[in-house]
């Protein structure tokens, strides 16, 4: 995943961080690489947010924990966005498209049903992406999505009426 993280930005965002995967791990890797990026961890659960703050403090990680619903926020700005086991792909694509005004890329973790989910998502979205096989599971893969655009739906039943005045 670190190969896909935009190291030239100031912020990396982890959506629905949960117990810290991948946000805390990436923050730790960036600290060891001596990179000056801040990781924004979005987790609406109070208990998980407390855990993330404690881990970040003890490991002296450069993180900021947002205990709020990311869907309620608008005009977010970041470099890379990471999404692992957060919400279904179409919902995450819509969230990024609607709520982030600036971002470099979306790193999306796909599980064993990922191919089918991804193919279905491509019916509604135009995506510029690179796919990378998972190192830990042969059925999984990562997507590095650089551009997200909604496809325009064509209504088959559109009728044209001519009105004469």
Model regions and ranges:
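A conserved beta-strand element that flanks and buttresses the S-adenosyl-L-methionine
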Residues: 82
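Short amphipathic alpha-helical segments
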Residues: 53-54, 93-96, 119-121
